[in-house]
UniProtKB/Swiss-Prot annotation:
Family: Belongs to the G-protein coupled receptor Fz/Smo family.
Record has Repressor as a keyword: no
Signal peptide: 1-23
Covalent S-S links between cysteines: 32-95, 41-88, 79-128, 121-141
Superkingdom field: Eukaryota
UniProt organism field: Dictyostelium discoideum (Social amoeba)
Name of the protein this chain belongs to: Frizzled and smoothened-like protein Q
Membrane topology summary: Multi-pass membrane protein
Gene encoding the protein: fslQ
Ranges of biased composition (kind: Low complexity): 544-556
Cytoplasmic side: 255-261, 327-341, 410-422, 512-578
Database matches in PANTHER family: FRIZZLED AND SMOOTHENED-LIKE PROTEIN P-RELATED, G-PROTEIN-COUPLED RECEPTOR GPCR FAMILY PROTEIN
Alphabetical keyword list: Disulfide bond, Glycoprotein, Membrane, Receptor, Signal, Transmembrane, Transmembrane helix
Glycosylation sites: 46, 64, 99, 104, 144, 155, 181, 233, 289
Extracellular-side positions: 24-233, 283-305, 363-388, 444-490
């Protein structure tokens, strides 16, 4: 992460330097000028007059050099002072004046630049080697001007003038620099922080812009829009949390007997509820991703970050792993069969859930990042996210697809044999729920790869922002990172995870039947003295009558209930005969 930030960001800066240097081709016929006190090189040069090329402006020259020197804050303490020396000697070359007499006794003045000595360039070559080799080869110590003259002569430069007469001048190279130790200090422009002052040895999750400058925390990728995303996320997650609580009550607390289908729905809802809980914990604290150390994002050593990371991973994997079981139950029901060895499935699923939650913790991978909350960090390119989340998600997606296709085939055959719109409506509703599962998993697992594919674009946006803050007022610089729409859609997709199961099973008439038949609910009503107001017996009878044709929705995994469904189908077929 550190090196990728460094290389991608410095490309823009050093392309800027290349453009500046290339524009400074050797042009003769210029003038000798005093070095302006506003020049950033005023205190670094041991002479007062410099050679100004024809057509150049002192004001513009000062601005260009100032911008470049500010960009050198993003190098290293070893490279910066030597690079500044080269820039100053090259941008403000010492002016040598020669007064010659022509054959007609006319005096002519030659103003010539004294170019930086090769020895000065060599002092910068080693500490700035990574930058020179990758980005500014034209500025190597062996570079030449377009007319063939060495840019950094070893001893001197020969100038020849034939138009005004046969004049040859040998001008010694210039090494009149005032060495200043203060120039080796890196001053990171706000809001960046100096790594030397803020990075704590032994602690991680710092985001380097260069070897010397790190991002401050918090850092908004989408300035001005983060609060909108947070509010949307909180609202959708709250709705999902409420529906999950309702599903837990309906299929886990109130039933007199919990069937296999109920347990699958209950487990999925518990996962959605736990996932929402991790968001609620983080939303209670402003800038939750930031540690108490300036510039450091929270890592696993911050126990609250570890806790929320574990909770989110456990909840998400729970919902993901139990969604294929819901699809499998739907398939088995469509075959009028029964799930066998459900207890074994239960043990295997929960074992994998606990292992995949704990495994990243043993690897120390739970931490916050610039773009995400506390979860599994893959900034170092490791495979922890793949092993613990994405590969299991892909397996779940494959199983959901398989069982959905098989279920559609079976339901179609069933409807052709015994047309029943109410049963068909229920089956279509479950299929829509499974499609929502697939959409959520597909989008959540593919967004990572889209973001990684666009990573260079993100780095370029950050590079432009850093270049802006390096040149002027940080308040005038705004980061324009791409992908806001996809980020917002991802929040919506993750936020409705728990709500999807409610669409398929929470709106079914069997829910009323479960509540009205529940002995626990009856006990609560009796304790609250509401049993005389709410007539359960009549409600139960009405519910039974309304659900007579859809009795298959209650379990599909019990032999007795399968028999009821078959009887109802036969009864429906008889009633529909003329």
């Amino acid at each position: 992460m550190k090196n990728s930030f460094l290389i991608n960001i410095l490309i823009i800066y050093y392309l800027f330097i290349i453009l500046f240097v290339n524009s400074q081709d050797l042009k003769l016929g210029g003038s000798c000028e005093l070095i302006d006190s506003n020049s950033p090189c005023f205190s670094k040069l041991n002479y007062t007059n410099f050679y100004l090329q024809p057509g150049d402006s002192i004001t513009q020259l000062n601005k260009n050099v100032s911008d470049i020197i500010r960009m050198l804050e993003f190098t290293t303490p070893e490279c910066k002072p030597n690079a500044i020396n080269i820039m100053c000697l090259k941008s403000y070359p010492k002016c040598e004046t020669y007064n010659e007499t022509l054959s007609n006794n006319t005096n002519i003045i030659f103003n010539l630049p004294s170019l930086p000595c090769n020895s000065i360039c060599l002092k910068a070559e080693t500490p700035c080697k990574i930058f020179i080799d990758n980005f500014i080869k034209d500025l190597s110590c062996n570079s030449n001007f377009s007319n063939g003259a060495p840019m950094f002569p070893i001893n001197s430069t020969d100038y020849e003038f034939k138009e005004s007469g046969n004049f040859n001048f040998n001008v010694e190279c210039n090494d009149n620099i005032i060495y200043d130790n203060s120039s080796s200090v890196i001053n990171c422009p706000a809001p960046l922080l100096n790594s030397k002052d803020h990075v704590i040895p032994g602690k991680t999750t710092y985001y380097y812009i260069t070897d010397s400058c790190i991002l401050d925390c918090p850092f908004e990728i989408y300035p001005g829009k983060t609060k909108i995303l947070d509010r949307t996320n909180y609202t959708l997650t709250s709705i999902s949390f409420i529906t999950c609580i309702f599903m837990i009550l309906t299929f886990g607390v109130l039933p007199n007997k919990i069937t296999h289908r109920m347990e699958s729905i209950l487990s999925f809802a518990c996962g959605g509820c736990i996932t929402a809980l991790s968001l609620f914990i983080q939303s209670r604290q402003d800038n939750f991703n930031c540690s108490s150390d300036p510039g450091r994002f929270k890592s696993q050593s911050d126990y609250l970050c570890l806790l929320t990371g574990l909770i989110f991973q456990f909840g998400a994997i729970t919902s993901i792993f139990w969604s294929p079981m819901i699809a499998y139950d739907f398939y088995i029901t469509s075959t009028l069969g029964k799930i066998r060895k459900f207890g074994l499935y239960r043990i295997v699923l929960w074992s994998f859930i606990f292992v995949l939650t704990a495994l990243p913790a043993f690897g120390g991978k739970y931490s916050a990042t610039v773009a995400t909350n506390c979860w599994i960090n893959s900034d170092d390119g490791s495979a922890w996210q793949y092993v613990s989340f994405y590969i299991p998600s892909w397996c779940a997606m494959g199983l959901i697809c398989l069982f959905s296709i098989l279920s559609v085939i079976n339901v179609s055959k069933m409807y052709i044999q015994t047309p029943n719109n109410r049963i068909l409506f229920f089956n279509i509703k479950i299929l829509i729920t499974l499609l929502l599962f697939l959409f959520v998993l597909t989008f959540a697992s593919s967004l990572k790869f889209y973001m990684e594919e666009r990573m260079d674009t993100y780095f370029d946006a950050i590079a432009v922002w850093v270049e802006c803050i390096g040149k002027g007022d940080p308040s005038q610089c705004e980061l324009h990172a791409p992908g806001y729409d996809l980020k917002a859609l991802n929040i919506v997709v993750i936020g409705i995870l728990g709500f999807t199961v409610f669409i398929g099973y929470g709106l079914d008439p069997i829910v009323i039947h479960i509540w009205m038949e529940s002995k626990k609910f009856q006990w609560v009503l009796k304790k609250c003295r509401l049993d005389k107001i709410i007539k359960l017996n009549n409600s139960i009878n009405n519910s039974n009558n309304n659900n007579n044709e859809t009795a298959s929705t209650s379990s599909g995994n019990e032999r007795k209930q399968t028999t009821v469904k078959m009887s109802n189908l036969k009864s429906t077929e008889i009633n529909q005969q003329p």
